[in-house]
Amino acid sequence: MGLAVGVVVLAVVLSAVFILPKAVSEFYYNPNEAAGQYEEMTTTRMDLDLSVYSELFLPGNHRDQVSAVSRGYGEYDIVIPQTSSWTGKFTSVSGRLVRGKLTLYDNNVLSRPIMQFYLPGDEDAWAAWEVDENGKETKMDTEARKEASIQDSKETIADYNDNDWYLAYVSLNDIMDYKDFIEWFQNLSNQKELEWGALWCAVHTEDEDGYCVEPNIGFCPLPSGMSVSWDREKYPYLSLLDNSDLSHVAEANDEETMQTHFTSMLSYIQDHDDILSMMGQTTDSPNRYQDMINFVQKNGLKIHGFAVSAKKKALLELYKEDVVSYIQTTPQN
C-alpha cells in the first residue's frame, strides 16, 4: 500500500515538474513558435512579430532577433539584441514575458518616438495659446510660431558635432507620390554625395472621413537586418529580405513591390496583434489597419515625411530643399 502511494506521489511530482509547466505554456503566446522555416533556418514568432512591428513604428530602431528562454508556465526570459548601429554602440534590451504580458527592464529603448510629422496644410499642428496674468487666453500667430520653430531647429542642427549621427524626422511641404519621393531622395544623395543611414518613409493614409489615420507609420525601402521566413502566399513581400531568395533584393524605386511590402505588414500586424499589446499599444480600433490598406490600394503609396539617420552636413543640406518643411532631430541610438 505504501509503495503504491509512493508511486502515485512520485507521478504527481514528476507531472508538476515536467508536464504541467509546458501544458500551461500552451495556452499563452509562445515567442519560440516557428513562424517560418527554410532549410535549417527557423524564424520564430517573436522574431517576425518584432521585425514587422519595429519597421512599421520604430524608425532607426529596427529589431528582428529575439532570444526567449522558457521558464515554464508561460514565462520567458527575453533578450532583444541590437544587430546594427551607425554609432558603433549596441544596446540590447532584456525583459520578461509572463503569460502574454511583456515587461522590458528599460522601456525607453523600444518606445515609440515622441517626435512627429507635421502634415501639409495642417495649421492646427502649430497652434498655441498664451495666457496673461489675468488668465486670459490669446491665440499666438500660427505662421510666426511655425517660422520660429523652424529657425530653432536650424540653429540646433548648426550646433551639432560634425561626426555624430542623428535621427531626423523630416516633414514635407506637400504629400508626394512614392515614385517622386524616392527619385528626389536618390538624386539628392547622388548629387550632394551625402552620407545617410537607414531611410524610413512615413506613409500617408486617410479614413473614410478624410482624416489621417496614423501619421507615424511607415516602412524601410532599403532592406537591412536578418533574412526571415514566413507565409509568403498570405503576406507577399512581408520582408524585403527573404531566406528563400537571397539573390534577389527589391529595388527601392520598385513602387509596386514597396506598396505590397507595406500593405502586407499592415495585414500581418492586423492578424497578429499580440505584439501591439505587448509593446503597450492599444488595439481598440478593429478597422484601423484595414482603413490604411484600403487607402493605399486605392491611391498608391503617398509620403508625407521620412526619417533618416544622418550627420550634421546632410541635415543642413536637407533644409535647403524646397520639398522639406521641418526637421526634428535626436541623437541616434
Model-identified regions with their sequence ranges:
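Extracytoplasmic/periplasmic/luminal assembly and interaction segments
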Residues: S51-I114
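Hydrophobic membrane-insertion alpha-helices, especially the h-region
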Residues: L3-I19
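Short acidic amphipathic segments
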Residues: S309, L315-T330
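Acidic, glycine-rich flexible loop segments
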Residues: D284-I303
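Short extracytoplasmic/periplasmic juxtamembrane "stem" segments immediately C-terminal to an N-terminal membrane anchor
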Residues: N30-D49
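Low-complexity, serine/threonine/proline-enriched polar segments
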Residues: S94, G100-K101, C201-Q281
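Short amphipathic alpha-helices in soluble, non-transmembrane regions
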Residues: I182-N190, L318-V323
